[in-house]
Amino acid sequence: LWFNGVNAPWDKWNDFGGGFNFEFWQDHFQKLHNSGVNAARIWIICNGDVGMAISADGTFDGATTAHWEDLDNLFYLAEQYQIYIMATVQSFDNFKDQNQNYQAWRTLIQDSDKTDMFVDNYIVPLVQRYGKSDYFWSVDLCNEPDWIVENEECGKLDWLYLEQYYAKAAAAIHANSDVLVTVGMGMIKYNSDSQQGNKISDSELQTVLSGDKYDKSLAYVDFYSTHWYTWMQGMWGYPFSESPTD
């Protein structure tokens, strides 16, 4: 299978459980299909302010009924128009200090038990609900987590907390489905042994995972999906002219 994909993050910010528009996505998927596109990366959680049952103390009880119903429609359309979905389930936006629930998300990611609640009450139900669909091909555990670590407005959290979430979620997804796992890293410097370390390498994720709740051998990403922008060229080169060794 050859993917010819696009980034189609949202129609309306926080579509799922919020302002989901069936007609928009139907028209969009039809246009993609007619243009020879067969895959789309979609943010099914944009910043966690809509569709999520999260308390101020970071306790996570799951997604709303509306969120699941909107996703039911999305995956129905994906099958109708043969669009393979990469579902992004978190972003640095969750942690930005202008968002309603930013402190709750920061607490969740820094509290191991509450991270487990997010995995148990959202990640696992997600892959169990849609994992049998031929058109649910991957989960992107976070969009550009680099900014959570680097930016004051996102809390400048430690990589350890993020890595522990990725390790737990990846292990849970692999234990419950055949859906692939990735993290949409914002910069190659955090996805490279020769720069500032590969924060999502197999060894890194399996090292930070403790206890016996998760199978360590399942804590890995299936592929890398690092982002690239033109402003990066002077620092890290052009990806299509560099080798993996470079």
What residue ranges belong to the model's regions?
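Long, structured stretches of catalytic cores involved in phosphate-ester chemistry, encompassing
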Residues: 240-242
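Active-site mouth of glycoside hydrolases
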Residues: 1-235, 244-245
